[in-house]
């Protein structure tokens, strides 16, 4: 347990940031799962919409520093390849 005031503040900030990052990472996972489910069903129009949604979430999270920009680009590339297989 921190004693110094600044250390206590750092603990509070870390807890807030951890919760915020966890929330965004959960959004990413959810968007990817929804996309993969639609791809598995073979619905092209809905898959395209889910791909756009997932790409948007990945770009936003990379911009906010939650994931690295290269990881976001790699994930988007993987999802696009999956989409192109059914399109």
UniProtKB/Swiss-Prot annotation:
GO cellular component: cytosol; small ribosomal subunit
GO molecular function: small ribosomal subunit rRNA binding; structural constituent of ribosome
InterPro entries per UniProt: Ribosomal_bS20, Ribosomal_bS20_sf
Keywords, alphabetical: Ribonucleoprotein, Ribosomal protein, RNA-binding, rRNA-binding
Family: Belongs to the bacterial ribosomal protein bS20 family.
NCBIfam families, per database record: S20
Job of this protein: Binds directly to 16S ribosomal RNA.
Protein name: Small ribosomal subunit protein bS20
Gene transcribed to yield this protein: rpsT
């Amino acid at each position: 347990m921190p004693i110094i005031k600044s250390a206590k503040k750092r603990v509070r900030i870390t807890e807030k940031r951890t919760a915020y990052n966890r929330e965004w990472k959960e959004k990413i996972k959810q968007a990817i799962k929804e996309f993969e489910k639609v791809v598995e069903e073979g619905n092209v129009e809905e898959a395209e919409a889910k791909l756009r949604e997932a790409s948007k979430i990945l770009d936003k999270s990379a911009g906010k520093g939650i994931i690295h920009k290269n990881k976001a680009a790699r994930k988007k590339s993987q999802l696009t390849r999956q989409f192109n297989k059914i399109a």
